[in-house]
Amino acid sequence: DHLPHDVYSPRL
């Protein structure tokens, strides 16, 4: 179970 990458490291 893992959250979308944008949750803890948003794409700039």
Swiss-Prot record:
This is Pyrokinin-4. The modification Leucine amide is found at L12. GO terms for cellular component: extracellular region. Mediates visceral muscle contractile activity (myotropic activity). The keyword Secreted applies. GO terms for biological process: neuropeptide signaling pathway. Belongs to the pyrokinin family. Keywords: Amidation, Neuropeptide, Secreted. Corpora cardiaca. It comes from Periplaneta americana (American cockroach). It is found in: Secreted.
